[in-house]
From Swiss-Prot:
Belongs to the alpha-carbonic anhydrase family. It catalyses: hydrogencarbonate + H(+) = CO2 + H2O; urea = cyanamide + H2O. The modification Phosphoserine is found at S2, S165, S172. Substrate binds at T198, T199. The active site is at H64. One of its GO terms (molecular function) is zinc ion binding. This is Carbonic anhydrase 2. The keyword Isomerase does not apply. Keywords: Acetylation, Cell membrane, Cytoplasm, Lyase, Membrane, Metal-binding, Phosphoprotein, Zinc. It comes from Oryctolagus cuniculus (Rabbit). Signal peptide: none annotated.
Amino acid sequence: MSHHWGYGKHNGPEHWHKDFPIANGERQSPIDIDTNAAKHDPSLKPLRVCYEHPISRRIINNGHSFNVEFDDSHDKTVLKEGPLEGTYRLIQFHFHWGSSDGQGSEHTVNKKKYAAELHLVHWNTKYGDFGKAVKHPDGLAVLGIFLKIGSATPGLQKVVDTLSSIKTKGKSVDFTDFDPRGLLPESLDYWTYPGSLTTPPLLECVTWIVLKEPITVSSEQMLKFRNLNFNKEAEPEEPMVDNWRPTQPLKGRQVKASFV
């Protein structure tokens, strides 16, 4: 059954609960990170981002965002330690962004919104594949990185330059030899909490790891994101903007910080 969810007035986040009742669940994402309430947990290990041998495959406009997909048939591109037990393989990354530079991120920090947010999606190898992993509360680890307006990040440029060839829903092109390490900030200090996918089916299977330090993106780079379309090629044009879910109630969850 194909649910036509999106980000518009009639199919946007406030409607998702009708088809996906877990939208009102106990561990939904994103959230606002209140830095005063987030407790430093000295037992949290430093995050190990082992992206030495990434094999990127293609980039695709899925009508909600665009995904850069990776070969996840081996442990060459993994996330481990930090709050995680075991090894999590990178399967894809995507972004959420706004119609203007003042909004676009899904998570917020003390209610502050960033221009965009990068999600690097990893699945727990103990479950064998992504489809099985999402059925478990510790199935996924998503590394969230804020983008703030500033100088252009060189590591983003190869992505940005490809967007014009995947303007509409369903379009994809080969996208090889991309190094996701170019998307990481210098510091890997993070906040972590148990949460969910931020798009339907909104499954509560994610250990969120949100980095404190943003990367920068230029206004020119952001404009290229906004040139994408939600629609398929022959359909009326709908600019792909504001593809973010608003923050959800914390419902008693504790956000932990890896830093003082």
